[in-house]
Amino acid sequence: MNLELIHEDFRGKISRLVEGFKTFPEVTIFETKAGFCRGGCIHRLSDESVVVLEGEIVYVTPKGYFNLTRGENFIISKNTPHYFLSRTDSVVLEWGPKEEEKKEKHADFRRIVDNINHERLTWKQ
């Protein structure tokens, strides 16, 4: 099992599992700094499962806010827009949607994510 870095920016890193687990060909690990958001997406065909490996996050969906800490998991049903805010530095493991599904963004939720990240980045400077 190997991790491949696929993206790194001011929020942290995103890596994916590149060997094994053929049932879920994309297993992604998000390392996110406190105060920043990830996501703003929607997956049309697959549910998404997540588990917090380190830290504290809050998942946001149209159904509400869901606080998660180390060891807790969450399932996001298909067709549910979502994002998470990292309350502390965090590491989140997610799996389920295929790579092509992960590309679709939900316009309203993505706008929220971009605004929060912009405000946080401005505040840090």
Language-model features, listed with the residues they occupy:
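A short, N-terminal "cap"/entry segment at the start of jelly-roll beta-barrel domains
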Residues: M1-E26, G39, K124-Q125
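Double-stranded beta-helix
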Residues: N2-F10, R87-Q125
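Conserved short histidine dyad/triad with adjacent acidic residue
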Residues: T28-R44
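A cytosolic small-molecule/anion-sensing beta-strand core signal
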Residues: L53-E54, R70, T88
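Structural motif
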Residues: E56, P81, D89-V91
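Short acidic-glycine-tyrosine-enriched beta hairpin
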Residues: P62-P81
